[in-house]
Amino acid sequence: MFVWGLFCILRIALKPDRKYAVRLISKTAISSSGRADDNQDCCMVRGSRPRWRSNFSKLF
């Protein structure tokens, strides 16, 4: 499971011209800029577990 997640992340990072990669990069830029009012934009909500599975299902 960990290897599959690492593979997916590397595949997205190495091909930034794809539509879902641009969407993922823009979401991380928005969430890291300090705007944490939208819980859907970031994969980590304060006090909870990471929501990798739901975010990855939106990509495909």
Swiss-Prot record:
Q: Per the UniProt entry, what is one GO biological process?
A: response to antibiotic
Q: What happens when the gene is disrupted?
A: Increased susceptibility to sub-lethal concentrations of aminoglycoside antibiotics neomycin, kanamycin, streptomycin, spectinomycin and kasugamycin, but not non-aminoglycosides tetracycline, chloramphenicol or erythromycin. 10-fold increased transcription of gvcB.
* Record flagged with keyword DNA repair: no
Q: Which UniProt keywords apply?
A: Antibiotic resistance, Transcription, Transcription regulation
- Which cysteines pair up through disulfides? They are none
Q: Which domain of life is it from?
A: Bacteria
Q: Other remarks?
A: This is a leaderless mRNA.
What job does the chain carry out?
A: Controls the expression of small non-coding RNA GcvB, which represses the expression of many amino acid transporter proteins and uptake of aminoglycoside antibiotics in cells. Might be a transcriptional activator. An RNA (xtr) with a tRNA-like fold possibly derived from tRNA-Arg(UCG) is encoded entirely within the protein; xtr does not have the sequence corresponding to tRNA anticodon or variable arms. 10 synonymous codon changes in the xtr region of xtpA have the same phenotype as a deletion mutation, suggesting the mRNA secondary structure is important for function.
Q: What is this protein called?
A: Putative transcriptional regulator XtpA
Q: Which organism is it from?
A: Escherichia coli (strain K12)
Q: Name the gene.
A: xtpA
